């Protein structure tokens, strides 16, 4: 039998992983790779930002408050009685969400910087967080506390809340006041709100 003119021999390639990873972040390579990393993560972060705004406006609490002092309690937080706008005590014509909207709609500044060993530090500036939103949502009558946090942890005095859709002349909101007597045994029903929305946002941002 004739000998084959083709022969195969085993070969192997040894790659120095540490050296390879270091080369990715060294000098010009670091800048070029950093650009590619940023190009990859930017759409992910931008989508997360858009989803954050969408989730905020789609939340039942946001929708109810935006409908003002004549809304129904569609969020279910008040047991179907009255509405959050008048219970919290927002003034007629006021915009409880102006500062929140500034926070969640702010343009994020994404920076990628090479460190060592193929690693990159990703910094996201202007990103909103739960605490900053709580600070931007003070009660109209108590600046040290957040009504948005109260939605999640509970609000007192629901039993003394009187709602009258036809109007109450002494009411800040126009349709609701707190009275001295206990009118009902209703208690506030907490619900996930800003914390849940922000946790989802952060998970989407870091998933890359």
Segments (PLM) and residue ranges:
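Short, Lys/Arg-rich flexible segments
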Residues: 1-208
